């Protein structure tokens, strides 16, 4: 009997495992900046995509308790910048929503969907990500039985909270779960801790 015979659940990281990430994030940031140019022109004049990224990083470092929630961090950093320039801070929510629409426009690797469809016939499939992609709004909609992100878990990988959540929600025990990810430190190490 192989140790794989007991597998009931296969979990997958998303970004850079099932699809390339950088092209999507770069485009989402570009689309957000266009939105800022139209809705908060003075902010767009004073900043670049790079300076906005740096400001957001500073906010995340100063607030480690929310750093796992990238959209909240993005919204708070925009609220801060909007307030400083006299813009309605409520616009930040709309800006993040615009970013998220473009963040969900991912391009899975060619063989991903057919392989996942086949695996779905035999296993419970779960997506786990630190990212903000909403799987049901991507080309992989309808594939996963469960999808969890760092916000759901309250912590980002490599903390094992997301894997603990997976175990709790699927009713599986650790030896029944196989995790597939691209990052040994953020994906493989915390999955092994269980």
Residue locations for each model-derived region?
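Glycine-rich phosphate-binding loop signature in dinucleotide/nucleotide-binding domains
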Residues: 3-5, 121-122, 169-176
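N-terminal helical cap/lid subdomain that shapes the substrate entry/recognition surface
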Residues: 3-110
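Short, acidic/turn-prone active-site loops that include or flank metal/cofactor-
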Residues: 150-156
């Amino acid at each position: 009997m192989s140790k794989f015979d007991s597998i009931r659940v296969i979990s997958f990281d998303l970004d850079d495992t099932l699809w390339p990430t950088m092209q999507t994030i770069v485009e989402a940031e570009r689309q957000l900046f266009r939105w800022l140019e139209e809705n908060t022109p003075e902010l767009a004049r004073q900043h670049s995509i790079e300076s906005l990224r740096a400001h957001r990083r500073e906010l995340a470092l100063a607030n480690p308790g929310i750093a796992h929630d990238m959209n909240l961090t993005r919204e708070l950093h925009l609220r801060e910048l909007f307030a400083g320039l006299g813009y309605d801070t409520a616009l930040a929510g709309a800006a993040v929503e615009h970013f998220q629409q473009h963040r969900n426009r991912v391009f899975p690797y060619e063989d991903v969907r057919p392989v996942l469809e086949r695996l779905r016939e035999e296993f419970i499939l779960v997506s786990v990500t630190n990212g903000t992609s909403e799987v049901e709004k991507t080309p992989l909609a309808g594939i996963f039985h469960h999808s969890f992100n760092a916000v759901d878990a309250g912590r980002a990988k490599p903390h094992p909270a997301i894997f603990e959540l997976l175990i709790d929600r699927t009713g599986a025990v650790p030896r029944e779960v196989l995790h597939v990810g691209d990052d040994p430190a953020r994906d493989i190490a915390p999955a092994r801790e269980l």
